[in-house]
Amino acid sequence: MSKIIQQLEQEQLRTDIPAFAQGDTVRVQVRVKEGGKERLQAFEGIVIAKRNRGLHSAFTVRKISNGEGVERVFQTHSPLIHSVELKRRGDVRRAKLYYLRNLSGKAARIKEKLN
């Protein structure tokens, strides 16, 4: 039974998503339906958390919009995600960057990975 489930999940996994980690800046293109039209909406920010659970993997992206912090959780293998573009690699030592919620301005910057 579980082999059948694993096989079905394996078929649904997306391979076009680049490898990224916490602290990286990414641009996620999301398919949005408005009325009868479908368009792409970009959401660019810092990945503050990742949850690796196979087909149920997710990641959280945080950005500052009009002085207000906005976080959005994306399902990694969702068909609503058109693409994920890696903009910049960040050098961090934590798995979850929730402390960025309390920081603002220059204090919330993340050092760029140089290699």
Swiss-Prot record:
GO terms for molecular function: structural constituent of ribosome. The keyword Ribonucleoprotein applies. GO terms for biological process: translation. InterPro entries: Ribosomal_bL19, Ribosomal_bL19_CS, Ribosomal_bL19_sf, Translation_prot_SH3-like_sf. The keyword Ribonucleoprotein applies. Pfam families: Ribosomal_L19. GO terms for cellular component: cytosolic large ribosomal subunit. Signal peptide: none annotated. Keywords: Ribonucleoprotein, Ribosomal protein. This protein is located at the 30S-50S ribosomal subunit interface and may play a role in the structure and function of the aminoacyl-tRNA binding site. Belongs to the bacterial ribosomal protein bL19 family. NCBIfam families: rplS_bact. This is Large ribosomal subunit protein bL19. It comes from Aeromonas hydrophila subsp. hydrophila (strain ATCC 7966 / DSM 30187 / BCRC 13018 / CCUG 14551 / JCM 1027 / KCTC 2358 / NCIMB 9240 / NCTC 8049).
